[in-house]
Amino acid sequence: MYIRRIIGFFLFCSIAFSAFAEMPYRTVLRKADDHFANREWQEAVAMYDVLLERRPGRVKTYVDAVVASAMMNDSSSIMQYVVRSEMQGLSLDSLFTGIDVLSRSIGQSGIYEQVLLLVKEQQPWFTRVTNNYLLGYYVFRHDAEKILAVADELLSVMPGQINYL
């Protein structure tokens, strides 16, 4: 009798786990969105990983995953998603714009700056690109000191651009 219960339990677990693995994409997406809305960041990131395995070319999923990772202050995870999006050939503009909009919508606009500074540090070949986005962010925040610092940095590599003066 005891052996039947153990076998039954293992059979139930194997069926349950296989059913979870075969969840429709929309169901997993809804669960990820629910976790994000409830600020359950680790669970949301786990769901976004599943979604990205199924559809790796969807920018919105990368945006959500980066913001959830930033809310956990996990810089390695943030960079993992940024690099994965680059490997998929997705536009950095779409990624950065999405992060900006989403972080503002949840009242955490500092996440956008955090991500830009991290990308600038980890991928120095994107310094000019990230500085342009940082300049726009600092103008939005009316942060004169940082505006001048970024503008000076941009002018040092592009002295002919008078719009940075």
Question: Model-derived features: where do they sit?
Answer:
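Register position in tetratricopeptide repeats
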Residues: 37-38, 71, 104-108, 140
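Alpha-helical segment of the N-proximal tetratricopeptide repeat
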Residues: 26-50, 54, 129-146
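Bacterial N-terminal signal peptides
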Residues: 8-18
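Canonical tetratricopeptide repeat
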Residues: 64, 97-98, 133
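Short coil turns that delineate tetratricopeptide repeat
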Residues: 56, 90, 124-125, 159-160
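TPR alpha-solenoid repeat register
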Residues: 61, 94-95, 130, 163-164
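Alpha-helical repeat scaffolds
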Residues: 76-87, 109-122, 145-155
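Residue-level signature for tetratricopeptide repeat
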Residues: 34, 68, 101-105, 136-137
